[in-house]
Design a protein with these regions (language model features):
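Acidic/histidine-enriched segments that form metal/cofactor-coordinating
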Residues: 26, 100-204, 250, 367-386, ...
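Histidine-acidic residue clusters that define the catalytic metal-binding segment
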Residues: 23-41, 175-214, 225, 242, ...
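Buried hydrophobic packing residues in well-ordered domains
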Residues: 46, 64, 81-83, 103, ...
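Sec-dependent N-terminal signal peptides
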Residues: 4-13
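Short acidic/His-enriched helical or mixed secondary-structure segments at domain edges of catalytic enzymes
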Residues: 153-172, 250-269, 307-316, 360-413
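An aromatic/glycine/proline-enriched structural segment found at the starts
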Residues: 21-28, 215-280, 437-471
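M16/MPP (pitrilysin/insulinase) zinc-metallopeptidase core fold and M16-derived inactive scaffolds
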Residues: 63-123, 186-187, 299-315, 328
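M16/insulysin-pitrilysin zinc metalloprotease superfamily fold
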Residues: 90-93, 120-151, 281, 300, ...
Length: 471
C-alpha cells in the first residue's frame, strides 16, 4: 500500500512538471466578422432607409432613429422626457388598448421614444408591425389624461431623489462639467416640469420628430424590393421639416485641478467623481486606445481603481471609469461611492491611479486580456440584429469608413502600450480635472482641506455657495 502511494505521488509530481514544461498554446486566429452592407434609398422628405436581408431566421427588426443635435429645453426642461414617456400609447388612428392588444396578439415587440422607435416580429407579420410602428411614431395620441399621469410620475420621482446622494452627485457632475446652459448640463426641477403643458409636448414633437436626420434600418427575413414600396407608402407622407439650429456655449475644463464639494448632511458615504470633458470621435486614431485605457483604469474588478480602492483598501464595493464619444462633446468620469472616513485618502488614490496610467506602460499581458475581452464581446454582439442596426447607423451618423466594423478586431489587436499611454495623456486631464464630491461635510471637509487642493463649494443644484460652517 505504501509503495503504491509513493508511486502515485511520483506520477502526480511528474505530470505537473511535464505540464509546466509544456509550451503554452498559441492564440487562435482572430475570428472573421462579415457584416453585410445595407441596400439604401432615400425618401423625398429626407428619411434614409437601410435594408439588410438575412433569411436565416423568420424574423425582422425595424429601427427608426433620429440623429438630431442636442437642444436646450431651458425653463421647460422635462418636455422631451415627458414626450418620450407619452409617445407609443396608441395613435390618433388606433386606441391605446387596441394598439397594445394587437401587438401582443402578434407576439411582437414595439418601443417608442422621442428619439425614434424599434420593433421586432416574425417576418410573416412584418408588414402589419411596420404599419403599427409608423402609426405610433408619426401619429402619436397625446392626450391630457396621459399627460397628467406621466407628469405626476416624474414629479414623484423628483421628490424621491431630493435627498438621494447619488442623484445629487450626478446632477452636479453634469451641471459643472457641461454648464447649466448646455443640453448635457441642464437638469429638470419641479418648477421646470410644472412649466410644461400638453401644447408644449405637441410643439416639441412637431419641431424635433422630423425626417430630416432620420434613419430607418430594416434587418432580417425580408426582401428589399418588397419592403421598399411599403416604406414609401407608410413614411412618404411624413412632412419634410428642418430642426432649428441652436447655439449654446461649449463646455470648458477648469484651468487647474480642484475639489468641487457638495454638502449633503444625510450622506453615509461620499460620492466621488473625477471629471473632464473631451471631444473623441469614433473615427479618431485614438478612439480604441482611449476606450481601452478607460477600461484598464476602471472597467471591471481587475482594473486599476478596483484593485486599489476595493481589493486593497476595502473602501468601496466598486469603482468605474467611463468615457464618452461621438460627434458632440462628451466626458471622462472616474467614480466611486467611498466610506466617509476614507474620502480624502480615496482622492489621493484616484489621482495616483490616473497618474499611473499616464506615466507607466501597461503590461502586455493585461492589455492583451482587456483586448481579448473586447473582441469576445464584439463577436457576441455582432450576432444580434440590434447590433447590426446600430453599426449601420454609426457608419452613417459618425461618418465612419464603410469597413470600420470589418476591421474592428484588427484595429483593437493593433493597440500597443504606447498607444494607451498616449491616449491617457491626451484625454485623462490630471491637471484640469474637477474632483466632485457629494458627502457629509462635517465629517470629510477637514481631511480634504489637508490635501492642499483648491476647494470650492456648491449646493445640490450646482450653484456656488460659501463654505459650510459647523458648530
Amino acid at each position: 500500500m505504501k509503495k503504491t502511494t509513493i508511486l502515485l505521488f511520483i506520477l502526480f509530481i511528474t505530470g505537473i512538471m511535464q505540464a509546466q514544461n509544456r509550451p503554452q498554446p498559441k492564440p487562435g486566429v482572430s475570428p472573421i466578422v462579415n457584416i453585410k452592407k445595407p441596400q439604401t434609398f432615400i425618401l423625398d422628405n429626407g428619411l434614409k432607409v437601410m435594408v439588410v436581408e438575412n433569411h436565416k431566421l423568420p424574423r425582422v427588426t425595424f429601427n427608426l432613429a433620429l440623429d438630431n443635435e442636442p437642444f436646450v429645453e431651458g425653463s421647460k426642461k422635462g418636455v422631451d422626457e415627458l414626450g418620450n414617456n407619452m409617445i407609443g400609447n396608441g395613435s390618433v388612428k388606433i386606441a391605446k388598448d387596441a394598439f397594445n392588444e394587437e401587438i401582443d396578439f402578434l407576439g411582437a415587440n414595439i418601443n417608442f421614444g422621442s428619439k425614434g422607435a424599434y420593433a421586432s416580429s416574425l417576418s410573416k407579420y412584418s408588414g402589419r408591425i411596420l404599419e403599427l410602428l409608423a402609426n405610433g411614431a408619426l401619429h402619436p395620441n397625446f392626450t391630457q389624461e396621459e399627460f397628467d399621469k406621466e407628469k405626476a410620475k416624474l414629479l414623484e420621482g423628483l421628490k424621491a431623489e431630493e435627498k438621494s446622494v447619488p442623484a445629487i452627485a450626478n446632477r452636479v457632475v453634469e451641471a459643472l462639467a457641461f454648464g447649466k446652459n448646455h443640453p448635457s448640463g441642464e437638469y429638470m426641477t419641479e418648477q421646470t416640469l410644472q412649466n410644461v403643458t400638453l401644447a408644449d409636448i405637441k410643439t416639441n414633437y412637431e419641431t424635433y420628430f422630423v425626417p430630416e436626420n432620420a434613419y430607418l434600418v430594416i434587418i432580417g427575413d425580408i426582401k428589399y424590393n418588397e419592403v421598399k414600396p411599403i416604406v414609401e407608402n407608410l413614411f412618404g407622407s411624413w412632412a419634410k421639416r428642418k430642426t432649428p439650429k441652436l447655439a449654446y456655449p461649449a463646455p470648458q475644463n477648469v484651468p487647474f485641478t480642484q475639489i468641487n464639494f457638495v454638502d449633503v448632511p444625510n450622506a453615509v458615504q461620499s460620492e466621488i467623481s473625477l471629471v473632464n470633458t473631451l471631444n473623441l470621435k469614433m473615427g479618431d486614431k485614438d478612439f480604441f486606445p482611449a476606450v481601452i485605457a478607460t477600461y484598464i483604469l476602471g472597467g471591471d474588478y481587475s482594473s486599476y481603481l478596483n484593485m486599489n480602492l476595493r481589493e486593497k483598501q476595502g473602501w468601496t464595493y466598486g469603482a468605474n471609469s467611463i468615457i464618452g464619444s461621438g460627434k458632440y462633446v462628451a466626458k471622462l468620469k472616474s467614480t466611486s461611492a467611498i466610506r466617509s472616513s476614507a474620502t480624502d485618502s480615496a482622492v489621493v488614490e484616484f489621482i495616483k491611479e490616473i497618474k499611473k496610467i499616464r506615466t507607466e506602460k501597461v503590461s502586455v499581458d493585461l492589455l492583451n486580456n482587456v483586448k481579448a475581452g473586447y473582441i469576445g464581446r464584439f463577436v457576441m454582439q455582432v450576432q444580434k440584429p440590434q447590433s447590426i442596426a446600430r453599426y449601420a447607423l454609426n457608419i452613417e451618423t459618425e461618418e465612419l469608413p464603410a469597413d470600420f466594423y470589418e476591421n474592428y478586431i484588427k484595429t483593437i489587436n493593433a493597440v500597443t502600450p504606447d498607444d494607451i499611454m498616449r491616449a491617457a495623456n491626451k484625454y485623462f486631464l490630471l491637471d484640469n480635472t474637477r474632483i466632485i464630491i457629494a458627502g457629509k461635510g462635517s465629517e470629510v471637509i477637514p481631511g480634504l482641506e489637508k490635501l492642499n487642493i483648491p476647494m470650492f463649494y456648491f449646493d445640490k443644484y450646482g450653484n456656488p455657495v460659501e463654505k459650510p460652517v459647523y458648530k
